[in-house]
Amino acid sequence: MLECWGAVMRRRVKTILIALCLGVSASPERAVAVAIATESRGVAVVRGQDGPPKDPNATRAADLVELVKLDPTIKLDIRYAGANNFLGKPVYKEARAFLQRPAADGLLAAHKELAKAGYGLMIHDGYRPWAITKLFWDMTSGFQREFVADPKTGSKHNRGCAVDLTMYDLGTGQVVEMPGGYDEMSRRSYPDYPGGPPEARAKRDLLRKVMESHGFTVEPNEWWHFNYQDWRLYPILDIAFGEIK
């Protein structure tokens, strides 16, 4: 087992070195993204666009804040820091979640409102480096691409203005049931999906109602994904978590 793991790590280091020779950013997230993509699809996927697009309409400076530092009762289940995601392997080096400050303030207000109904927010993802968005695009095709952003335009996650989340029960600490699972690439993920248990749909709709009352809109095909209203004003970023001040 140790010999196999050593071989995997040697291959990954070699892959990262190749990526650097091709001019790919050396940030931790970018290196991990390149390593995963090249192991699975071949080194050609790292060619072409090698940095986030520039948006001339993004007039606000980035002001990313860490969510758990605002309120420790906000729970984290950062799926991309582990293997429980649609890729089946970690793409983040750290289990952390950030948003632009106004978006974080809106999220905190939603969290406090939900507490009155006995629920809290559990975060699956917030700000996402652009390199990871490119990885997701490179690793998907067909119907799956309905659920990932095109790196040519960047995603609202890259701007620090999108959050993936669910609710947990304040009494039990358990995650509430929803009509579909997080990152599930099926129609059960649609915010208006009519199937599943009525209780699960009611909780999904409660989450949407509260989030939308605090400056967010739900993504049309993902019940868990909410975009902050001023996302257009922020730049597309490719900053590693460890570099956020």
Regions found by a protein language model. Give the residues of each.
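Sec/Tat signal peptide C-region and signal peptidase I cleavage site
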Residues: 27-32
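Bacterial N-terminal signal peptides
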Residues: 14-25
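Segments that shape or occlude catalytic/ligand-binding pockets
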Residues: 129
